[in-house]
Regions:
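Hydrophobic, small-residue-rich alpha-helical packing segments that form membrane-like cores
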Residues: 226-228
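Active-site and substrate-binding clefts of carbohydrate-active enzymes
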Residues: 30-83, 90-133, 140-143, 247-557
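Short, solvent-exposed turn/loop segments enriched in Gly/Ser/Thr/Pro and often Arg
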Residues: 89-94, 175-177, 212-221, 241, ...
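Glycine-rich phosphate-binding "P-loop"
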Residues: 175-197
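Short, Lys/Arg-enriched N-terminal segments with co-localized hydrophobic residues
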Residues: 19-28
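Acidic (Asp/Glu)-rich catalytic clusters
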Residues: 75-81, 155-172, 367-368
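CE4/NodB-like, metal-dependent polysaccharide N-deacetylase domain
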Residues: 190-215, 358-379
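Conserved short loop/turn motifs at secondary-structure junctions
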Residues: 209-220, 381-385, 504
């Protein structure tokens, strides 16, 4: 009888030892872990009352430039036998919009216009060799987008869920409408509603409770972990200084999670790996060979030619068709040279190799002093990959492929898998923090947006009052639930953020005011027992997020 070798409790025939999978060898030899975490989020923008609203195109651009390209990357990895592991957050507003039939239909029409435009560009530039080459590139790209969109039957959430079911993708949640929790902490019921509604929404869409949560803007305040524990969540993500300034100071910095006193773990962002990808100045996205974001056909083409593809009122807008590269830091947009996707893809592969090399050296250095094995957590906005950084999906693809084939120093992992493998960590109290400007709350509370908070606080107090009511009939039940929706939508951190950045400010102001006005109207109607059923039905149709919400989530804790 052939001799046997026993390895981790598994028996292998000696003759078959050479057939031990590359993944098992990787696990045996890995010194540490790397965990990229893209955060997929957009504010809830849906306007059935209008035929066209520019801000709905935030979603359409995200689908075309980020979500479908990322999905295609995952499909390619799986098809090629790469057993990838990645954690990704998908926020309730984004999931709701991706599954909304109206927005799906409008995206289909949006994609059809893009397909029409690039076909037109192909003919228009038949005598301009390189421009025609780029037009053909976009024709092929949109054909792939269309093929994926139709193959998924328009259900991108379901397509990503397949990778959740296969244990390749760990999808985590975020708060209900991306509300900025530290500025709600004086109203625990409001914080609880943001968390609990999100967890219920996740379970309705993914068929299981979430294990982790991306705190909106990675913003944490002391004691928040108690509500996370009550919601059944096992971990959350923070910016690095939230872990580094914890008490007592964690011995391993951000390279191991810390446990809060409730048992909920906190993972801190690694500065080095984040900077290499985030920064347009010292990071990869600013390379001269990459596509220039700010030079778009919508602004460059002759007006009469491009008019059918811009805003119906005649204003120009970005189309997503861009023919130029970053080129260099010295000149203006008029000095940009023509883009070449072939060389840009080559550069993305080179940068992916550099990223993998740096993570190897980082893990090797950390493993000399850290036990258990270190983990490098790299959170990013998902929309960076594809929308802002056109070559980002190529970069992610190459990082996973090179990590699988070209190194054995680290293992790509889910965050929850790391906790399973290494369940003993230091207990600390995390520090108040965010990943915003200067690391705290300044971007969401300043002279540009401070005016919204007295109104939000008053509405919160009123909603807590409504939370104790028992509805007299079905109409009041609907009104109470709609009031909860309006408050949640008004609390979105995106509106305060946009007001601070100075872009699309009128829309952010209008959205904040409209949700507060609808909430206050509902409050008065409920209190006076004068609910307008026709108006309520109209509002329910416009702001239809969280169809299964229960207003009682605002009752005293």
């Amino acid at each position: 009888m052939r001799s046997l070798i026993v390895l981790f409790g598994l028996k292998f025939k000696r003759a078959a030892l050479a057939e031990v999978s590359s993944e098992l060898r990787r696990i045996i030899m890995a010194l540490g872990y790397v965990a990229p975490v893209p955060h997929a989020h957009l504010p809830f923008v849906r306007h059935p009352e209008s035929d066209y609203v520019l801000e709905e195109e935030w979603l359409f651009e995200g689908i075309t430039e980020t979500y479908i390209p990322l999905l295609r990357v995952l499909e390619g990895l799986k098809r090629d036998g790469i057993d990838f592991k990645m954690t990704m957050s998908m926020t309730p507003p984004l999931v709701s919009m991706l599954r909304d039939p109206l927005l799906q239909e409008r995206y289909d029409q949006h994609l059809a216009k893009l397909e029409e435009l690039v076909d037109k560009e192909l003919k228009h530039n038949e005598h301009y060799g390189h421009i025609r080459y780029l037009a053909q590139h976009y024709v092929s790209e949109f054909q792939q987008i269309r093929e994926t969109w139709e193959r998924c039957d328009r259900d991108l959430v379901g397509a990503f869920k397949q990778f959740l079911d296969s244990n390749n993708l760990e999808i985590i949640t975020c708060c209900a409408t991306h509300g900025y929790l530290p500025l709600m902490k004086m109203y625990p019921q409001a914080v609880w509603a943001q968390i609990q509604v999100a967890c219920e929404h996740y379970e309705q869409n993914f068929g299981r409770p979430p294990k982790g949560i991306w705190l909106p803007e990675c913003a944490y305040y002391e004691g928040l972990e108690r509500m996370l524990a009550d919601a059944g969540l096992r971990y959350f993500l923070m910016d690095g200084h939230g872990v580094l300034y914890a008490r007592p100071r964690p011995r391993f910095g951000t390279y191991a999670p810390i446990f809060t006193e409730t048992g909920v773990a906190a993972f801190g962002r690694d500065h080095e790996s984040s900077q290499q990808v985030w920064s347009s100045e010292v990071g990869y996205p600013g390379d001269p060979l990459y596509r220039e974001f700010y030079k778009d056909l919508g602004w460059e083409a002759e007006y009469d030619y491009i008019k059918p593809y811009i805003i119906p009122n005649g204003q120009r807008k970005n189309t997503g068709i861009k023919y130029h590269k970053i080129t260099g830091s010295g000149g203006g947009l008029s000095d940009k040279e023509l883009y070449d996707p072939y060389w840009a893809r080559e550069k993305a592969a080179e940068h992916a190799g550099n990223f993998v090399y740096n993570r190897e050296r980082q893990i090797e250095h950390l493993a000399e002093t850290i036990q258990p094995p270190p983990i490098v957590v790299s959170p990013y906005d998902a929309e960076l990959f594809g929308h802002w950084w056109y070559e980002g999906p190529w970069f992610i693809d190459y990082v996973f492929r090179k990590s699988w084939h070209d190194q054995k120093t680290y293992e790509m992992t889910h965050l929850v898998d790391y906790l399973r493998k290494h369940p003993t960590q230091k207990v600390c109290k995390p520090s108040q923090s965010s990943w915003g400007y200067k690391g705290f709350h300044e971007y969401w509370l300043n002279e540009a947006n401070a005016w919204i908070y007295p109104h939000l606080h008053k509405a919160t107090e009123r909603m807590m009052e409504l939370g104790t009511r028992e509805p007299a009939d079905d109409l009041e039940w609907k009104a109470l639930n709609q009031a909860a929706r309006e408050l949640l939508l008004a609390q979105s951190s995106d509106w305060a953020f946009i007001m601070c950045t100075g872009t699309m400010v009128p829309y952010a102001v209008r959205r904040t005011r409209s949700h507060l006005m609808r909430f206050n109207q509902l409050y008065e109607d409920i209190k006076q027992d004068k609910i307008d059923s026709g108006w309520l039905e109209k509002v329910e149709n416009i702001d239809n997020i969280f169809p299964n919400i229960n207003y009682r989530v605002y009752r005293p804790l």
